[in-house]
From Swiss-Prot:
A molecular-function term among this protein's GO annotations: DNA binding
Xref: PANTHER family: FORKHEAD BOX PROTEIN (PTHR11829), FORKHEAD BOX PROTEIN D3 (PTHR11829:SF405)
Keywords: Activator, Developmental protein, DNA-binding, Nucleus, Repressor, Transcription, Transcription regulation
Native species: Rattus norvegicus (Rat)
Protein name as annotated: Forkhead box protein D3
Assigned GO CC terms: chromatin; nucleus
PROSITE patterns xrefs: FORK_HEAD_1, FORK_HEAD_2, FORK_HEAD_3
Gene expressing this chain: Foxd3
SUPFAM superfamilies, A to Z: Winged helix' DNA-binding domain
The protein's assembly and partners: Interacts with POU5F1.
Lineage, top ranks: Eukaryota, Metazoa, Chordata, Craniata, Vertebrata
InterPro entries found in the cross-reference section: FH_FOXD3, Fork_head_dom, FOX_domain-containing, TF_fork_head_CS_1, TF_fork_head_CS_2, WH-like_DNA-bd_sf, WH_DNA-bd_sf
Length: 101
């Protein structure tokens, strides 16, 4: 299997943008990636930490606490509205610029 040509930031962004409410938990993001890209099914445990690291490190991702009536584990993650144009014309291969809040 060949590794997809996308950065972790691009993979996370794809996952969030395809979700109906434009927000996902870490496990939802990882599920999207492994379902869409067979390469990550093989290497599952190792890259999950990289996803977690990128979510907390990059300003383009915003943590949203769960609502009181919504049980489950982990916070939701969404995109900062000002970062939605960080990929040129919807191409996830190249990021236009690093987003800073």
């Amino acid at each position: 299997l060949v590794k997809p040509p996308y950065s972790y930031i691009a993979l996370i962004t794809m996952a969030i943008l395809q979700s109906p409410q434009k927000k996902l938990t870490l496990s939802g993001i990882c599920e999207f990636i492994s379902n869409r890209f067979p390469y990550y099914r093989e290497k599952f445990p190792a890259w999950q930490n990289s996803i977690r690291h990128n979510l907390s490190l990059n300003d383009c991702f915003v943590k949203i606490p769960r609502e009181p009536g919504n049980p489950g584990k982990g916070n939701y993650w969404t995109l900062d509205p000002q970062s939605e144009d960080m990929f040129d014309n919807g191409s996830f291969l190249r990021r236009r610029k690093r987003f800073k809040r």
